[in-house]
Amino acid sequence: MPLAFHHVAIQCADLARCERFYREVLGLPVLRRWPRDGGGDRSVWLSVDGAGTGFLALERADEAPAARPWRDGKAGLHLVALRIGASERAAWEGRLEAAGVPVVHRTRWTLYFHDPEGNRIGLTHYPEDA
């Protein structure tokens, strides 16, 4: 079996706010919730591919993240990029704007922005050209 992505996990100090962002702004449906001892969620899994075979895991964190510029030169995960169709790009840009999410960088193929906790996210149609 060839290697394939299973999931990406992002730690969130405000899990509910992050879940709302990924569900309401990006339209990712909830696959599963993992409860936390004492109530609430420890983790929320969101489908990225519509089939549930690739997902984004939002994990509860204990402290808020430090603000980071778009490129900070530090090693580690730089961004999570999600695939869109080239013909959908303008609609996605409008959706982000309507939700108050600023696009911080653009290329020919990709829109870059931050989630509520400063994680870098991209919507890309690379290498598809429209």
List PLM regions with ranges.
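Short, small/polar residue-rich loop motifs at catalytic or cofactor-binding pockets
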Residues: 106-108
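Short glycine/proline-centered loop/turn elements that form peptide/ligand docking sites
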Residues: 34-41, 130
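Short Asp/Glu-rich motifs
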Residues: 41-42, 115
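Glyoxalase I/VOC metalloenzyme domain signal
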Residues: 1-5, 12-32, 48-103, 114-130
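Short acidic loop-to-beta-strand element that houses the catalytic metal-binding Asp/Glu
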Residues: 44-46
